[in-house]
């Protein structure tokens, strides 16, 4: 498989949930957070890889990402516009970092405990592909995942902490962040 300039694409890809895959290629996201176990079992190392936009994305994840990215001046496209189930670009993995070795300029993206340090994102004309865990050899597929019904009718919920509808040309603003849709284990809820 080649890109528009007939350069061969990297044979390995990393599947990343949207909207974070978009943020890597278009939004300046320079760290892809992973556990050490995921890095080891996924055979992740430093090389140029394709970024695969995974098929999964829930409304709570998207809403939280809107808030998170807005806090660092990155505006997300509407959820229905995000490719899911395909290769969307390439990036160089240049290091594997922990918090104390993560360069200060990359800290807004670091959520730990480990991260792949990314450079040189290059968007591609999207190519449908099925994702896997870790680095995987990708092959072109037949079609992208169509938008879920919530994505096509998405209007951010106010829940008392957002301002919407009055000035549609302004970005969504939150006084407080939406509930974080991940990161709490069942054990911590006891």
Predicted regions and their residues:
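Structured alpha/beta reader/binder surfaces that contact nucleic acids or chromatin modification marks
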Residues: 2-190
């Amino acid at each position: 498989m080649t890109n528009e300039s007939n350069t061969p694409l990297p044979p390995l890809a990393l599947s990343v949930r949207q909207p974070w895959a978009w943020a890597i290629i278009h939004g300046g996201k320079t760290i892809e957070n992973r556990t050490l176990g995921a890095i080891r079992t996924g055979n992740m190392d430093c090389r140029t890889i394709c970024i695969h936009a995974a098929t999964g994305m829930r409304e709570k994840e998207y809403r939280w990402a809107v808030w998170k990215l807005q806090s660092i001046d990155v505006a997300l496209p509407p959820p229905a516009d995000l490719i899911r189930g395909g290769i969307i670009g390439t990036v160089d993995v240049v290091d594997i970092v922990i918090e104390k070795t993560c360069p200060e300029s990359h800290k807004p993206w670091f959520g730990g405990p480990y991260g792949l340090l990314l450079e040189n994102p290059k968007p591609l004309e999207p190519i449908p592909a099925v994702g896997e865990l870790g680095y995987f050899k990708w092959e072109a597929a037949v079609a992208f995942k169509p938008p879920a019904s919530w994505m096509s009718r998405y209007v951010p919920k106010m829940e008392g902490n957002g301002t919407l509808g009055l000035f549609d040309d302004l970005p969504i603003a939150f006084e407080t962040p939406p509930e974080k849709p991940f990161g709490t284990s069942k054990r911590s809820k006891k």
